[in-house]
Amino acid sequence: MTIYQVLPRLYGNRHTTGIQGGTIRQNGCGKMLDFSLKALRALRGQGYTHIWYTGLLEHATQTVYPDIAPDNPDIVKGKAGSPYAVKDYYDIDPDLARRVADRRAEFCELLARSHKAGLKVIMDFVPNHVARHYVSDAAPQGVRPLGADDDTALHFSPDNNFYYCPDETLRIGSYTESPARASGNDVFHAHPTPDDWYETCKLNYGGMSPQSSTWQKMTDILLYWAEQGVDGFRCDMAEMVPVSFWHHAIAAVLSRHPHVRFIAEVYNPQLYRDYIRHGGFHYLYDKAGFYDTLRAVVAGGLSTQSIPSVWQSTDDIRPHMLYFLENHDEQRLASPFFASAPQAGRPAMAVAALMGTGPLMVYSGQEIGERGMTAEGYSGQDGRTSIFDYWAYPFCRKLAGREALTPEEEALREWYTSLLQLRRKLRGTPFYDLMYANPALTRQYAFLRGEGRETRLIVANFHGEEVRLTVRLPRHAVSFLHLPCAPGPYTIAVPAHDYAVLTLEPSPPFGHSPLRRSRRGVRDTVDTLIP
């Protein structure tokens, strides 16, 4: 599984200029119809198997639409609003439709185009919290609104959908709420700070029973979208929802739609196995270990010798761990806060793509070196692409084919395409870490993928200069992978901030193989020392 994450709000925006804190009229907005069949097929050709359309569900916004209940601007972050302050679980965000009244039809068309292009579709499921002004006008007949039957005089009741602060009033600007409800990030009082998720209300799963109101309503929402043809759900802040709920809900969906896949945003490594084995998740974010370590290697100079212990800590569940270097929450790889340049991030991306046996995710714009250094309004110059503002990004126009890529951007996208093609070839092959046999390597990471005559030696170079180095191949690797060559050191040249790949061939007489070309186009002499 190789996922391409993209915000439809940004991708197809036709505007060429932006005003800080601007409205949708001033700054424009992408639409679902902007994802043409040609563009989707191009993504499939680049090596992606799934596309995660981020922000499809209707959410709180400062934009006012006829026949849709408006939101108080004081409880909306940014003019566009956060896609994770969901206002109606059963509806599509009106910003994303060419014709607002036809937004459901346009979504169905997007789903059909994606499938026709060979891409499976992932959408957000935000189970922990909703927008404070949650109004579901698209729910199927007979569905009771969240909170409609709550006893608001109780702080907690297993039958309530929300948590309440009786006799307390929430005041945020001109917005008041009485009794106050708990905020999404577990603030159980009426005084959230600007750094809290004050624009959201936390949902109550405390009934701990499939018969509880919240469990039933949230499971029905998953079933609804699965029945529309959605192939997977990226479950926001899944660890803030009891694992027992996931055990129930995922089983309910898979009993009717066994092809659907569930991805969990979980940051606590102590919870990983429970959310996989009991909760039923297919995949989990590997941020607290893998992402954080690779980032420290790139940005902080941490030794590459630290990488093996990270993957070893999740070795028993490694096929379930989703690797990434960018997403909407994290700073861009090419930003000054991370690698500072697109090229400097390439070795980390090569490691993430080629050593793992689980899924990989790329964030739209990453493949052409987007830096995320625009101050859009609610978001500042923080190395992230804003999820709160309307904005006209040059990288989005380029990806949509409305502006030409620079030669550097084109070369980087070709690099990503080549990397993903190699990743596909290596799918399902054994992995063997060579770092224990090469303790002198601190800015390179060496490993094997494959078996027998199809085994490849892969070295990623985190150094800013080309290196020519010797990689020792231990006897255990030769026997374990049934290699056709003898153990011994191999000399390999690796370009600056890049990776090189060599296929291990049978050892010729006298211990020398002919000159050959590596995957990255560097001519390498491979010397095999036969004991």
Language model segments and positions:
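Conserved, mostly hydrophobic/aromatic
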Residues: 6, 53, 89, 114, ...
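Hydrophobic faces of well-ordered beta-strands that scaffold small-molecule active sites
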Residues: 2-4, 51-53, 121-123, 233, ...
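Active-site-proximal helices and loops of the catalytic beta/alpha 8
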Residues: 142-145, 153, 160, 220-223, ...
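Loop/helix patches that line or flank the sugar-binding groove of alpha-linked glycan CAZymes
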Residues: 14, 18, 61, 77, ...
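The substrate-binding groove and active-site-proximal loops of carbohydrate-active enzymes
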Residues: 13, 17-33, 85-104, 199-214, ...
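C-terminal beta-sandwich/jelly-roll accessory domains of carbohydrate-active enzymes
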Residues: 464-531
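N-terminal structural segment of carbohydrate-active enzymes
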Residues: 1-120, 128, 135-139, 150, ...
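Aromatic- and acidic-residue-enriched segments that line the glycan-binding/catalytic groove
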Residues: 59-86, 127-192, 277-284, 375-388
